[in-house]
Amino acid sequence: MSSRRTAPWFLAVVALALAGCATRPINAPLEQVDRKSGYRYETRAERPGNDPSTVVVLAFSGGGMRAAAFSYGVLEELRRTEVSIGGNRTRLIDEVDLITGVSGGSFTALAYGLHGERLFDDYEQRFLKRDVQGELVARSLNPFNWWKFVGGSAGRSELAAEYYDEILFNGATFGDLDRG
């Protein structure tokens, strides 16, 4: 083969080899943990208006967008429901001490943890009423995103994480939960 014919192949092999060297950033380990601060049950349980004698725990299951919509409906109903605790009227949502979620249910749990009452302003439009799966497929098929798949440094999960961050989480980190 002539050098003209081998040059493109050589460049392709070099590009693939270099792409194989790419790695995802790894979270730096914590040097020290302060158990009296940050987002944890012990620091969040005693909030103004929350009765310490009542513990309400929500567990949102998976199931994709249906689970996200169902868990959102649960929060809406808890927001509308008033109860009497210790002679005081309060909304049931104000008594929620802990929310856990997996898969589809985790979107609503996390969004509520980050945004609190603001969740009810635009969660439906920003997330529930979007064609999320269609957008993720479109991004996967977009040639401008294909470079992310080379070398194993990223994949569909990273594309999805970028999209969720763009439409729902806005660059939030675990540390932002403490402010919600």
Predicted segments, located by residue:
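Catalytic domains of lipid- and phosphate-ester/thioester hydrolases
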Residues: 2-8, 12, 20-180
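Conserved Rossmann-like nucleotide-binding pocket used by diverse enzymes
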Residues: 17
